[in-house]
């Protein structure tokens, strides 16, 4: 009975894990660092308190601006009362028009002063708020860049700590420019393209994500294009600057017969494979290939699941020749698993 599995085509490339966002946390004000409220390496949320700068000078500045605002508000209230009296007296010509205009100008001037005072209060309040430094994004904090007690300033380029956003996290890898059309066509199908991250030795799958974007230009020097995939990474299997192998699924076929690419040959009559019968004798079968990559190919017609195909020594074969079957060794990597199969498999998985 045939298994209802899938023949899959993958594009592969080398890449590096990058944080979704990397932020150097800096102070916006100058002052003495009083406290750090994080542990190196911990996960933080946007808005979490990370550090405090001595707020004394900012509290004093705020009190001064608030006092000036209160004083000028009192002056404005008095000026408005005088203006009201002048307006009444002007009706009986007890004050001149010039005196009335001067009082009106004084009120307008004081109103402008009030607006300036309010801006000064807001600025002083902002300076005080900035003495409490919070996380701008979710992420993992790195090693602290400054110790408590040091004077810091808004001009410090090293900052206090660096936050890398790892939930989610991105993988940037490269593909040959010849693969661009394949990726674009797969994107137009409307379904997210699955991307797998494998370790440096290509022996262990670390995580699964989806294609995020293609770069907008090809690197003319290398003939490649950068591709970005995004991973949820809740298990922290991926880490910034980690080197990985990427495998992107771009096409699938249901109920597919899959054979190693090495078994597929090309002759005058078209594509063919050598098939072994129960007596280990070979016969040529014309086939119709489908999607393929460097390691395996889908066969749409010409052989069936369970047929045995020859992958080595093909140039020495003739019709009806009897061959010695050598069992394939166990495979460990995705590529080895694809090439080690001697049998045509229904929806063989890598």
Curated annotation (Swiss-Prot):
<dbReference type="GO" id="GO:0015562">
    <property type="term" value="F:efflux transmembrane transporter activity"/>
</dbReference>
<feature type="compositionally biased region" description="Basic and acidic residues">
    <location>
        <begin position="334"/>
        <end position="350"/>
    </location>
</feature>
<comment type="subunit">
    <text>Part of a tripartite efflux system composed of MdtA, MdtB and MdtC.</text>
</comment>
<keyword id="KW-0813">Transport</keyword>
<dbReference type="GO" id="GO:0005886">
    <property type="term" value="C:plasma membrane"/>
</dbReference>
<dbReference type="GO" id="GO:1990281">
    <property type="term" value="C:efflux pump complex"/>
</dbReference>
<dbReference type="Pfam" id="PF16576">
    <property type="entry name" value="HlyD_D23"/>
</dbReference>
<keyword id="KW-0472">Membrane</keyword>
<dbReference type="InterPro" id="IPR032317">
    <property type="entry name" value="CusB_D23"/>
</dbReference>
<dbReference type="InterPro" id="IPR006143">
    <property type="entry name" value="RND_pump_MFP"/>
</dbReference>
<keyword id="KW-1003">Cell membrane</keyword>
<feature type="region of interest" description="Disordered">
    <location>
        <begin position="327"/>
        <end position="350"/>
    </location>
</feature>
<protein>
    <recommendedName>
        <fullName>Putative multidrug resistance protein MdtA</fullName>
    </recommendedName>
</protein>
<comment type="similarity">
    <text>Belongs to the membrane fusion protein (MFP) (TC 8.A.1) family.</text>
</comment>
<keyword id="KW-0997">Cell inner membrane</keyword>
């Amino acid at each position: 009975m045939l298994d209802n599995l899938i023949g899959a085509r993958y594009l592969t490339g080398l890449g590096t894990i990058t944080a979704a966002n990397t932020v150097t946390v800096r102070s916006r004000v100058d002052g003495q660092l009083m406290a750090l409220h994080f542990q190196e390496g911990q996960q933080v949320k946007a808005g979490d308190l990370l550090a405090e700068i001595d707020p004394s000078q900012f509290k004093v500045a705020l009190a001064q601006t608030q006092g000036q605002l209160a004083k000028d508000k009192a002056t404005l209230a008095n000026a408005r009362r005088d203006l009201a009296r002048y307006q009444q007296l002007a009706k009986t010509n007890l004050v001149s028009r010039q005196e009335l205009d001067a009082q009106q100008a004084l009120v307008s001037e004081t109103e402008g002063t009030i607006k300036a005072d309010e801006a000064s209060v807001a600025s002083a309040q902002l300076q005080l708020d900035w003495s409490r430094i919070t996380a701008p994004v979710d992420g993992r904090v790195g090693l602290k860049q400054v110790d408590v007690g040091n004077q810091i300033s808004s001009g410090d380029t090293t900052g206090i700590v660096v936050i890398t956003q790892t939930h989610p996290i991105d993988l940037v890898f490269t593909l040959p420019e010849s693969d661009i059309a394949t990726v674009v066509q797969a994107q137009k199908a409307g379904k997210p393209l699955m991307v797998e991250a494998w370790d440096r030795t290509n022996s262990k799958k670390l995580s699964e994500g989806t294609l995020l974007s293609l770069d907008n230009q090809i690197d003319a020097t290398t003939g490649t294009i950068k591709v970005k995939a995004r991973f949820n990474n809740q298990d922290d299997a991926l880490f910034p600057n980690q080197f990985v192998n990427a495998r992107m699924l771009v096409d699938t076929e249901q109920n597919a017969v899959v054979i190693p690419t090495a078994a597929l040959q090309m002759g005058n009559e078209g594509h063919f494979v050598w098939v072994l019968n129960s007596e280990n004798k070979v016969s040529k079968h014309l086939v119709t290939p489908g999607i393929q990559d460097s390691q395996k190919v889908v066969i749409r017609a010409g052989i069936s699941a369970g047929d045995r195909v020859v992958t080595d020594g093909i140039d020495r074969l003739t019709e009806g020749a009897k061959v010695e079957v050598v069992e394939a060794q166990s495979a460990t990597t995705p590529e080895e698993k694809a090439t080690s199969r001697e049998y045509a498999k229904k929806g063989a998985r890598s």
